[in-house]
Amino acid sequence: MSGRSVRAETRSRAKDDIKRVMAAIEKVRKWEKKWVTVGDTSLRIYKWVPVTEPKVDDIDLKVTDENSGLLRRPKPNAKKTKNKKKTKDDKCGSELTTPENSSSPGMMDMNDDNSNQSSIADASPVKQENSSTCSPAPDQNVSAQPEGSEVKLEESHSNASEQQDSEVSSGQNSHSSIESSLNSSEKAETQTSGDKEITVEASKNSQDSDDGTPPCKKVKGDSSQPNNDGI
């Protein structure tokens, strides 16, 4: 029995504590910090003040700006807003009753179509003029192409003639080189033959000198021998 009574007491205390906490929360919710003037003076203090329940008209005044977090400026009274709405309605009614707007939407569409057609008609001669001005360009291109082809043909002919001249000059150079080589070989042969003759004469002279008789006497002796044979 003692245990049950203790549990009952704790439950009642817990309930009392919960009630106190809820009362404190509600009290805190009804308080806010605001700048308040002290009496009739211009002195202002930032302190906790109980929240006064706002009226329906003042709900919009306390809507905070999402970006700045500041209170927005107070909106005009309901009477002023009603007057503004009336003036806007009057203006809209006057615009609707004007003779320009009195025409049906079908007429407006017709006018728009006519204006579009006229603008297209005005733009068509401009396009024709542009096409006429642009048309001579292909003729110029066609005339420029044969000129370019003629220039290319002349260049090819000049290149061919230059190649022929180079071939002729190379052939002449080859002929001249062959002739010079032949002349040099002939000169070498003549020099070698002359050297051989000189060596033969030198050998004969050396033989005569070995015999001790002068060459003139030898010649005379050789000529007298056939005469004696004839006698």
UniProtKB/Swiss-Prot annotation:
Residues 95-105, 113-146, 158-173, 222-231 have a biased composition (Polar residues). Residues 174-185 have a biased composition (Low complexity). Residues 72-86 have a biased composition (Basic residues). InterPro entries: BCL7 (IPR006804). Residues 186-199 have a biased composition (Basic and acidic residues). It comes from the Eukaryota. It holds the Pfam family BCL_N. Residues 62-231 are annotated as: Disordered. Belongs to the BCL7 family. This is B-cell CLL/lymphoma 7 protein family member A. It comes from Xenopus tropicalis.
